């Protein structure tokens, strides 16, 4: 398994697949693990439909679909935008376990994120809060919930305190640093916001949202030429969403 992992991490997918094929014949646990890793390779190769078909067929062939394998499957579906199907699986897990089970906060988080992605915010918020109630020190769950609140323009002071905690738990994480800076921006603490957003853009120089945020805070601090540079840069990033690009085009004309 370790050798296959090394091949996978170095993008040597042909050799990795050969090892996974051998492993798949060594019992159900290896059968599932091999399929999951092969599905990840298909995703890397841009074969999403093939990946989803493989992992779904494998899951359905298992004689025992235990909660850990079901969680793996749900997470894979969520990460590949099959949100409704992942919600069903997370719900299946949550119904089978108690609040003190180690999978409980993870399943609640996973389902909460999936709900948020399909626009079911009330259900998402409830699940994310429930996840943190069961396990309060999950930095990424704190970040997801707090950033969602900030984007909705609610509970910004509370979000800032939560993000300060998340930053203490996971120092130097660019996503958390960006969220922290964005909370300060929304509170009109522009100098403080610039400190964090500059750190975030240094850690994640190709992230569209981080660059957009940094452009905004530069503008508010009077650095308008630099702001336009960062906004323009986002327009050239392949993974920048069209809504973000349209918003930036407006800012390049009108400013903030």
Predicted regions located by residue number:
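Terminal, low-structured helical/coil segments at or just beyond the last alpha-helical repeat
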Residues: 213, 220-256
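TPR alpha-solenoid repeat register
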Residues: 33-34, 69, 103, 107, ...
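Short coil turns that delineate tetratricopeptide repeat
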Residues: 28-29, 63-64, 98, 102, ...
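Canonical tetratricopeptide repeat
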Residues: 2, 37, 72, 110, ...
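Register position in tetratricopeptide repeats
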Residues: 9, 44, 79, 110-113, ...
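Residue-level recognition of tetratricopeptide repeat
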Residues: 5, 40, 75, 113, ...
């Amino acid at each position: 398994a370790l050798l296959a992992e090394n091949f996978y991490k170095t993008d040597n997918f042909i050799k990795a697949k050969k090892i996974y094929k051998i492993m798949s014949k060594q019992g159900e646990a290896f059968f599932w693990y091999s399929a999951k890793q092969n599905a990840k390779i298909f995703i890397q190769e841009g074969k999403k439909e093939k990946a989803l078909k493989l992992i779904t067929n494998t899951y359905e062939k298992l004689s025992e679909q235990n909660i850990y394998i079901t969680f793996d499957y749900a997470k894979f579906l969520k990460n590949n935008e099959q949100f409704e199907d992942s919600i069903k699986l997370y719900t299946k897990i949550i119904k089978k376990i108690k609040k003190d089970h180690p999978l409980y906060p993870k399943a609640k988080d996973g389902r909460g994120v999936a709900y948020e992605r399909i626009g079911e915010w009330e259900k998402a918020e409830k699940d994310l809060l429930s996840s943190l109630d069961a396990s309060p020190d999950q930095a990424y769950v704190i970040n997801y919930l707090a950033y969602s609140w900030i984007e909705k323009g609610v509970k910004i002071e509370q979000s800032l305190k939560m993000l300060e905690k998340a930053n203490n738990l996971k120092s130097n994480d660019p996503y958390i640093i960006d969220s922290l800076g964005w909370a300060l921006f929304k509170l009109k603490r522009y100098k403080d916001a610039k400190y964090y957003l500059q750190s975030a853009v240094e850690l994640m120089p190709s992230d569209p949202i981080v660059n957009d945020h940094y452009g905004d805070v530069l503008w508010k601090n009077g650095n308008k030429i630099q702001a336009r540079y960062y906004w323009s840069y986002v327009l050239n990033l392949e993974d920048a969403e069209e809504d973000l690009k349209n918003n930036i085009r407006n800012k390049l004309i009108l400013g903030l």
